[in-house]
Amino acid sequence: MIVKKMPILQGFPDFETVKFFTGKFFQKYNFSPVFYDIETTGLSRKTTYLYLVGAVGIEDKTWTFYQWMAENNKEEETILRIFSQFLEQYDCLISYNGERFDQPYLEARYEKYGLPSPFEGKISLDLYLTLKPLKTLLKLPAMKQPCLEEFLGIKNRIYDNGKECIQLYKDFLKKRDHVIANEVLGHNLEDVLGLGRIFEMLGYLCIYDSEYEITYGEFDGENLILEMKLPCKLPQKFSNGNEQFYLTGEDELVKFIVKAENSKLKQYYPNPKDYYYLPEEDTVIPKSLGSGIDKKHRKAATKDTCYTWYTCSDAFLNNPQQQKEYLRHTLPYLLGTLK
């Protein structure tokens, strides 16, 4: 078996950043995270096997990278046992597509050898599933990990992709060439270090979750302009919008511009099934209050008609709490209109 271990001195998020985001998702959490990625000889959990595990955890207050690579298929069980023991010191497992592939695959291999699952009682944070809502906002061509890395400006991958690594690993088994082994290990290293880099993209989700403070509000006669401060720095600037609104962000600041109609704004609401739309008044009313309205004058609200009107008054422009409440209701709808 090939075993590697080394400290990570740069290119990985600091402890406080990881603690902030993992704590945001999991309240009962002791801050013992581990990032991991696996390499297998195929997708089938029954006919292929695990040959490499890479992980990053905290040791002596330092991010440390670990790898275990099988030099033959008989070493799979040994790697599984070592990884299981390794995971005992961690309670939050961070992966990319781990809940759909890595973890189910590993659980099947543990079962094959009659070994208990090391995932019992562990918290899982799958960055693929968690970051998926950002695809449209950040104009990502796909949700593959290298696509996210490229958005962040990381274009220095030098090793082969996962599919090509399978053939490289098979070549290594035949030739015992450690140059080939290093290529396989290098690909896994890039994948695991990439997890740390795209982890910071969780900051964009603060926009969706209303985790910001309004720092500026202005109405120029046609548009409402709001500026927001996030609790973290964005790893890369972005901009997006359509005919209704425009959103741009850099570092901790996000700027929001939305068109008004006659100095009024549409405030959208979730759960349109709970509202009636009144076409003559161009607004909605809760069903609990609208049951007495003639059916000729009401319709079932849709996500596009589930709104009331908001006046850009001086009182509104001088009240950050009202502005945030407006955004909390309206921004999720507007983000959903992006294509």
List PLM regions with ranges.
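Short beta-strand scaffold segments in enzyme catalytic cores
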Residues: 53-55
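DEDD superfamily 3′-5′ metal-dependent exonuclease/proofreading module
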Residues: 1-36, 41-48, 58-339
